[in-house]
Amino acid sequence: MDVLAEANGTFALNLLKTLGKDNSKNVFFSPMSMSCALAMVYMGAKGNTAAQMAQILSFNKSGGGGDIHQGFQSLLTEVNKTGTQYLLRMANRLFGEKSCDFLSSFRDSCQKFYQAEMEELDFISAVEKSRKHINTWVAEKTEGKIAELLSPGSVDPLTRLVLVNAVYFRGNWDEQFDKENTEERLFKVSKNEEKPVQMMFKQSTFKKTYIGEIFTQILVLPYVGKELNMIIMLPDETTDLRTVEKELTYEKFVEWTRLDMMDEEEVEVSLPRFKLEESYDMESVLRNLGMTDAFELGKADFSGMSQTDLSLSKVVHKSFVEVNEEGTEAAAATAAIMMMRCARFVPRFCADHPFLFFIQHSKTNGILFCGRFSSP
């Protein structure tokens, strides 16, 4: 699992940097579900297509493929287990053109390792029906939060393989914020721009630390049951968040967020209430990272999946997060942010300027979600 956590964590931070190239934009995605979805495709890839995928997914370090898929099997079992005090639903499915004769061995492996189905649709003669079918499936899996994953025209009669990957998360804070303390404050989007946000406030004991080399505070907000944590990285007001992003590697992330190395102290926390809904067409992102062959007919080698000549037509990722006084819900809408109130000598953690946030699964160290809040 540790090897897999490192591979997934490395991929997560590479994605964060790629998706976050435009500094003014908010970012939110689930690297774990993207890794799962792509690893499933990787299972059917061969030759150079597989080599490129292993490279961007950081599977090279882990020595071979078989243990990767078993690793995902354990990870998904752990993350999707029932009886938790949070709700997390990860839905992966490959939709293939039915004339392509997908190998039963590949379908069986999808089910065994990834709890995922390979479903055959008629893209050639019923493209709109296929699109609606995929959207309905996603909506069901995400409690209706992600309703229109594939927009009209996003699949066509030439579509052969659509990889769909959706996540829904809802969790309450271990210690909730009192709604009466929430008030409108200004969020410093940049040196010369401020926007109003609804700022939540709580004074309590939390784990936190300060990383001197990047002038950044790190705060850990646990969810009920303490199986999941939100980790917030907030640079000092004089430090640009880009500096933090540039320095961030998986090794540093692990070192900086080690709970046993943090102080538990009373702190005044101001955190914006926000909602983010982000949708990414992952093809250009994955191509930029070096995964090119998979998308090109003639170059793509998915002979472990089907004997038909196949390429990946579409990789869509959509995710939602809502952070409020009760906790977090992956849900659709727009965002809001925060500022601080008068302090005694209690340290302040005042997220009234851009910050990074991560939702991590404690037991597996898996980064379930990554985000950047730049602007309400």
From Swiss-Prot:
Tissues showing expression: Expressed in keratinocytes (at protein level). Highest levels in skeletal muscle. Also found in placenta, cardiac muscle, lung, liver, kidney and pancreas. Expressed in the inner ear hair cells. Expressed abundantly by normal mast cells in different tissues and by mast cells in mastocytoma lesions.
SMART domains attached to this UniProt entry: SERPIN
Keyword Oxidoreductase: no
Transmembrane intervals: none
Positions of post-translational Phosphoserine modification: 151
Modified residues (N-acetylmethionine): 1
Alphabetized UniProt keyword annotations: Acetylation, Cytoplasm, Deafness, Non-syndromic deafness, Phosphoprotein, Protease inhibitor, Serine protease inhibitor
GO biological process, one term: cellular response to osmotic stress
GO molecular function annotation: protease binding; serine-type endopeptidase inhibitor activity
The keyword Cytoplasm appears for this protein: yes
Compartment(s) where it occurs, according to its Swiss-Prot or TrEMBL record: Cytoplasm
Binding partners and assembly: Forms a complex with the monomeric form of beta-tryptase.
Record: disease: Deafness, autosomal recessive, 91: A form of non-syndromic deafness characterized by progressive and age-dependent sensorineural hearing loss. Vestibular function is normal.
Protein name per Swiss-Prot or TrEMBL: Serpin B6
Organism: Homo sapiens (Human)
Encoding gene (name): SERPINB6
